[in-house]
Amino acid sequence: MHFFDFFRGLDINEGLRKMQSTDGAVLIDVRTREEYADAHIPGSLNIPLNELQSAENRISDKSTPLFVHCLSGGRSRQAVHFLKRLGYTDVTDIGGIHHYSGKIEKGA
């Protein structure tokens, strides 16, 4: 482990393992609809960063464990801060799908 790894947070693969062992967890992909259609993690919910306000309509329980990712980690970091401002209490940034090593799906 490198010094800066401490500040980086969870790797997406580690984050997904943690999510799978968390009851009621939701995986949110904040990439654009086009990016999501090209390839996404099975079971993920696409809420693009610029539509994140709609999360309240789709996930009403603010204590739901949310695991957030994007392509490289920049948008997911922004999304985590925004979701916390909306009142969600259990939000984890798991970084970018470009480090993901599992199955992917195509299409919306």
Residue ranges of predicted features:
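Rhodanese-like catalytic fold shared by cysteine-dependent sulfurtransferases
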Residues: 1-25, 33-64, 74-108
